[in-house]
Each structure stands twice: as C-alpha cells, then as structure tokens.
Amino acid sequence: MTQDENHQLLERELAVDDPWRLDTSAFEQQRYAQMLRMSRRDGDAASALEVGCAAGAFTEMLAPLCERLTVVDVMPQAIERTRLRTGKWSHISWVTCDIQRFSTTEQFDLIVVAEVLYYLRDVVEMHAAIRNLVSMLAPDETLIFGSARDEICQRWGHAAGAETVIALFNESLSEIERRHCCTGSASEDCLIVRFLKPGGASAQSNAGH
C-alpha cells in the first residue's frame, strides 16, 4: 500500500463518527486498558509523547497522567478531532508531522506509539522511525508499543506488524512486559509491549557488578 493510499484510507476513517470503533469496541477498550496500565507502572509522567492519536480516545485517558504531553500525528484531521476532544487540558502540545521527520531536543520519560508504524512504506522506514523514537526517550524510561500482528498487517497491505517491529525495538531497548489482546475476529489480534531504555542509573548499577 502506498503512502497516498494510506492517507486516503485514514481520511475516510477519520470522517466517520467513531473511527475504527475506538469508543465502542470491546477489543479496543481491552487494548487501551493494557496500554494505560503499562503507562502508569512508574507513576505520572513529567513529559510524555503520543505518536498517532487517531480520534483522541486514548489521548483522553493519557492526558491526566502527564504534566506535559506532546501529540504527533501525520493527519491534520486526527490532530483536530483530538484537540477538540481534549480541550479541557492546557498542557498538551500538538504537532502535525511524520514521525520520521519529527524532531525535538526534549527527552521524554514516556512514549506511546500504537497502531502507527505499519503505515510506513517498508521495514527500512520503520527502522528509521524507531531510531528516532529511541533517541527521544530518556535513559531508564518507558516506551509502550502496540500493533496488530504481522499476518494481519500484511493482509491489510502493509509491510509488517507487531512481531517485526518488536524485534527492531529490541535492538536498542529492553522488553519488560508483553501482552496479547485478541477476540474471535481475524482482525482483532494485537501485541502490546512495554520497553525500557537502558542507561543512566541502571547502566551504572550493572557496571558495578
């Protein structure tokens, strides 16, 4: 699937009242519950980054857990819908940008990236996006990744899904926890993983042993 086709698909989905049934699907609620639980493991985040906000369902859950939240999405419609949904919070910054090109000097202590990376053209682009994300994650801090599995994403016309991307993240981060969310539907099957970036206190502690 080309990038133009991806964007056209996203535009159509974002035009409906409940895109991807994010507010009404039991599967999506199960997925969000796991992502939120993992996000809260280390307490509230001083500075968090959410990559891909869809229509704001998870952003609305994540915002109260952060002192500062930066939301990045390539689709202006997604940013606008989420901004309207989360209007009561003033600590959210909005960036319309491809994650491969997003750049900041800020180091985040929580990054959440779910159901996003399979929209990239190929594994080379996924790897580049992952390197960019890892560079923005502070040492000893958490990244939450979620995605439909490889077989499903490839059936949708994408290059790869969860298993491939998890292997790429494991090249530079430490996998701490993995959860499998699924239903009887062939398209409702995803993996959610909590990663930790080695370094800082943990690296010094390991060096002393």
From Swiss-Prot:
It holds the Pfam family NodS. GO terms for biological process: methylation; oligosaccharide biosynthetic process. Keywords: Methyltransferase, Nodulation, Transferase. Its EC number is 2.1.1.-. GO terms for molecular function: methyltransferase activity; S-adenosylmethionine-dependent methyltransferase activity. Belongs to the NodS family. SAM-utilizing methyltransferase involved in nod factor synthesis. PANTHER family: TRANS-ACONITATE 2-METHYLTRANSFERASE-RELATED. This is Nodulation protein S. It comes from Bradyrhizobium diazoefficiens (strain JCM 10833 / BCRC 13528 / IAM 13628 / NBRC 14792 / USDA 110).
